[in-house]
Amino acid sequence: MASSSPLQAAAGDRLLPGGPGPSPEAEDDPGEGFEFDDSDDDEDTNAGPDVPRSALETEADTPLIHLDSAPVIDLEPKPEPAQPQTQRPAAVSNGDAVDAAFSEVQRSGWRRKSSRRIERFTFPAVEEDVIYDDVPCENLDAQQPEAERNQPYEDARQDRAPQEPEDLGWSSSEFESYSEDSGEEAKPEAEPTKHRVSFQPKMTQLMKAAKSGTKDGLEKTRIAVMRKVSFLHRKDVLGDSEEEDMGLLEVSVSDIKPPAPELGPMPAGLTPQQVVRRHILGSIVQSEGSYVDSLKRVLQDYRNPLMEMEPKALSARKCRAVFFRVKEILHCHSMFQIALSSRVAEWDSTEKIGDLFVASFSKSMVLDVYSDYVNNFTNAMSIIKKACLTKPAFLEFLKRRQVCSPDRVTLYGLMVKPIQRFPQFILLLQDMLKNTPRGHPDRLSLQLALTELETLAEKLNEQKRLADQVAEIQQLTKSVSDRSSLNKLLTSGQRQLLLCETLTETVYGDRGQLIKSKERRVFLLNDMLVCANINFKGQLEISSLAPLGPKYVVKWSTALPQVQVVEVGQEGGPYDKDNALIQHAGAKKASAAGQAQNKVYLGPPRLFQELQDLQKDLAVVEQITLLVSTLHGTYQNLNMTVAQDWCLALQRLMRVKEEEIHSANKCRLRLLLPGKPDKSGRPISFMVVFITPNPLSKISWVNRLHLAKIGLREENQPGWLCPDEDKQSRAPFWCPILACCVPAFSFRGLSLQLGALVHSPVSCPLLGFSAVSTSLPQGYLWVGGGQEGAGGQVEIFSLNRPSPRTVKSFPLAAPVLCMEYIPEPEEGDGRNGDKGCPAADASAGVHPTICLGLQDGSILLYSSVDTGTQCLAACRSPGLQPVLCLRHSPFHLLAGLQDGTLAAYPRTSGSVPWDLESPPMCLPVGPGPVRALLSLEEAVWASCGPRVTVLDATSLQTQQSFEAHQDEAVSVTHMVKAGSGVWMAFSSGSSIRLFHTETLEHLQEINIATRTTFLLPGQKHLCVTSLLICQGLLWVGTDQGVIVLLPVPRLEGIPKITGKGMVSLNGHCGPVAFLAVATSILAPDILRSDQEEAEGQQAEEDKPDGPAPEPAPVPASHVGGELIRKKGILLQYRLRSTSHLPGPLLSVREPEPADGSALEHSEEDGSIYEMVDDPDVWVHNRPCARDAHRKEICSVAIISGGRGYRNFGSAAGSPGKPAPCGETDSTLLIWQAPLTL
């Protein structure tokens, strides 16, 4: 009943000694299309560099063990000891599945992280000679004593090999080192039995501690396990010994299936929030149960049968590569499900769930296991795809399993669930947090849990992106000849894939007719653009079972600086400029007619033909107008007024059609590429036109092309560095790029010091489609400063282009110390609930304003709508104290003064939003100056010295105060909020601290100096001078001009810092005076394609918005309109009323009675004019209902201000690129981030 060799007992199931997963150098390279060798023997020879040949041969020659197989005899038999009489469940075998018992067995554990391969934990020497059975005994459960059958964890250390299919713990590979290294024979049974008997109570006790220990956190349980269990102390060190020590606790559950987590009956008297929290908890339990069942199905329905199948439909090595880390992921969630059951049982008494998520998913083991799975996912799908194409048995197996499954979910649908799991958790925890009131004991733990899950999901997303990038580049490299220069560029390791998408290349004729179109795969690398043909081979029907990857054939490639985006109509009107003077790639020479017109219309042929028809119709109507002017009679609806209306309507329709053609360009990407020079040596360019799937795709391409070109400049090579980074890592693709460096003031002769900067977002409708994608955030920058003891200066820059441009500057009486941008009030912001703070009247026309605080105590209010710099209001602070900081809330304009006073100006309902004429409410905050203000939803934070005072946002009553720093001589200078935390910087020291917004608890402290030591090796004293949080990044400016970038969570959790961060190699020669953000939201109409606009217009036709003065026409009157609609033209315009005109109504119908009930216009009028009394229809189409839910596009730029410009990456003594500003001039550095799509 037992084999004499544990090694052979699990040879078909164990992981190779060289590593548990697929080798990166294996034959199944991710993304390979169809060139492969079907020989499993050849594949096993390339399993990996760390696998010895003997191990591979042993695995290849060793058959799998089945339930009905005979024992495998070792090549060198040893004396076989007497078999123990210990009984065990019949469902247990060495790595073989018994479907009835699969769902009852769960294993979980911690493992040691290794940089190259997983470490295997081993049992002590006294246990290493345990005999593993190969063939299970049948019906042993009936012979087993009742006392042993009732022990829930009795099989934790049975003398047998662990299960593989239903066993969710270790496979026999974890124990193979003992069978390989140990040359001793098996010892008598008495000693192993003794150790086993003494071990079982310990395991039972530890398991009970693991279940109850979740109340205090799994970390304590892990420490206890690691300290008490001796076999966890000994392990084979296969990786870096400096990695984090982690044990692996194997947990086995009895054959009796544990009850699923289930909430008890709802108690009476629960609040609505408690009821909602119970429902959300039920959703978490149900979602987790479904996820665990899906993981079990992957192992039970796919992996185990494939491993047992004879003949093999998939080799053992490929099978392990496909299902790599699935079992370990199931371990993590099985333990989480056990802990979740305990929490559900005690929910009504504790109502805590957040700390369980923190304890379960903050371990490095979870990140390691999921990272391995995510990184291997592309490779796994590639193996499945190739097996479907070459092995009909495997394809039939997948189809049969899908048909037999209750929900018809494919293997791909099951295996993609781990990638989607954490976003699902985040949504559930967000709902739970929204329904958890402040002060609840679970609120802080939920916020921490949300942070942990978001951080984990971000890391997995980044790793998945990098894995996909590598796979795409590898697939592209295989399509290029080994001797070509492109192959050398791709294999150099210096190329980064920024964007990759399947686009449709189109070729139009001289009249807009479509000549041909074909799908191309376009690759945007960091320094080149590659276009490839897509060739699919094999059976396309397998794409429903696994993603079908293409094989590429490179068509052309070009250096990125030579690529130009040519936008139709960017220089002029859309109709006059909708042409191309350059021959299209693949198109024939233009015809004589096209050459005569010197225009090649690239718009869709339907729109172009309709525009031509409108031009002809307008010429006919103009002739009719001339004939109408010759009529001798006077008719009500046939006169010059009506004829002029016809002409106006057609002209408006032509403008609408031109806009539709321009809208079609929103999905048309035109690239001007360099070609081979002609015979005379002149450079020739050719045009390539791609049709993108939607306008969002084109915006992304134009934006990434623009930023990629900027990234090739000297100052951005490199622009960011990670401290202690390895040689292969680069700045992420989302990293902001230095776009420009400009002087802050136009008068360079004056030594003006920077004070503050704000961005006023103003949409510019004149910008073209590509200009919106490449320009900085639309609007104006207001830069304020001045000279000490002299006057001040304000400079206004326009950002409606790729580089800022000065539009106006004006002097002030004193230097500007602070600025605040105040947007127009929104409806429902809570002001109506306060009787003391009247709401602003919407009809008063309150526009966005900019408030300036000066050194002489002046507070100035300017309109930010235009650059007229009209001062709306002005006042002086109490005691003429310098205004150090300004903040606004829905109720007050707050000013922090030099003498420690907080001045509050109430909101008014007039055109000026704040009452600056009346004396303000003065609140003493402390003895020192009020240096920083922060406006939260329900509170206002004011700093004075090292203390921070929390005030009520409505009444400004002091709620509480706390010390942010222990040194009385240190002041809080900056406060920025993100999620549920506030980061603070101080007047001295290089540390920043994080505080909770609700409990005011100090959560984290980060020393910035450790991030800058490699740039400033001799610098010991560093001070933080500015802070900014934007798009999940914490920007930190220092007094040495260095800017540090640290990642922080974006959601409602705690914004703690977990990553290393990056340091900018572009900075200032002096302290960073400020860090500001410029943000603008692109108009939703820019995302509407021509098809959506046509649908929106049709919806407008079917259901007019607003009352129409004309009655709805009868069905007979729809004939003319339908004929017009069939041609794609709808005559919609504002009709001038003709009822007041003299003369009878010209109609074939009998005249209506002249009474009060007569209609002003007859049905014939409606059939002719299709009247819509809305001038907006002429120019703009109303948005569809779906557009209300369209995701916004956010354009972001970060601006830093300081003295001069300095590149820290240039070598000492090297001239480098000349700085655009002097070392003493006030300078603005502008970083542009990729559009947030």
UniProtKB/Swiss-Prot annotation:
Residues 146-163, 184-194 have a biased composition (Basic and acidic residues). GO terms for cellular component: cytoplasm; cytosol. GO terms for biological process: actin cytoskeleton organization; positive regulation of stress fiber assembly; SREBP signaling pathway. The modification Phosphoserine is found at residues 39, 241. The keyword Zinc does not apply. Residues 276-463 form the DH domain. Signal peptide: none annotated. Keywords: Cytoplasm, Guanine-nucleotide releasing factor, Phosphoprotein. InterPro entries: ARHGEF10/ARHGEF17, DBL_dom_sf, DH_dom, PH-like_dom_sf, WD40/YVTN_repeat-like_dom_sf, WD40_repeat_dom_sf. Pfam families: PH_19, RhoGEF, WD40_2. The modification Phosphotyrosine is found at residues 132, 153. It is found in: Cytoplasm. Residues 1-117, 132-203, 1091-1118, 1142-1164 are annotated as: Disordered. Residues 25-45 have a biased composition (Acidic residues). It comes from the Eukaryota. One of its GO terms (molecular function) is guanyl-nucleotide exchange factor activity. Interacts with RHOA, RHOB and RHOC. Acts as a guanine nucleotide exchange factor (GEF) for RHOA, RHOB and RHOC. This is Rho guanine nucleotide exchange factor 10-like protein. It comes from Bos taurus (Bovine).
